[in-house]
């Protein structure tokens, strides 16, 4: 299993519109992606947000993660994406 770790900044003035885009556009697309296992979007603090999305393979994670998938939401800027193999789960 592999994780896509996404760092982003959120414009607080556009947070409600960003949350709506997440729920109505991004989540459905990610859930239906090949190899999707689970996803977690953490509430932003001081304009900084994170998501952790798990896939069966690294290739599937790379094909779905931004900017390849064109994740777009008002007031959101993707500041970085890393891919890691999941070492353990509990």
Residue ranges and their predicted role:
Residues 1-49, 56-67, 76-90:
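Short S/T/G/P-rich N-terminal loop/turn motif that feeds into the first structured element of a domain
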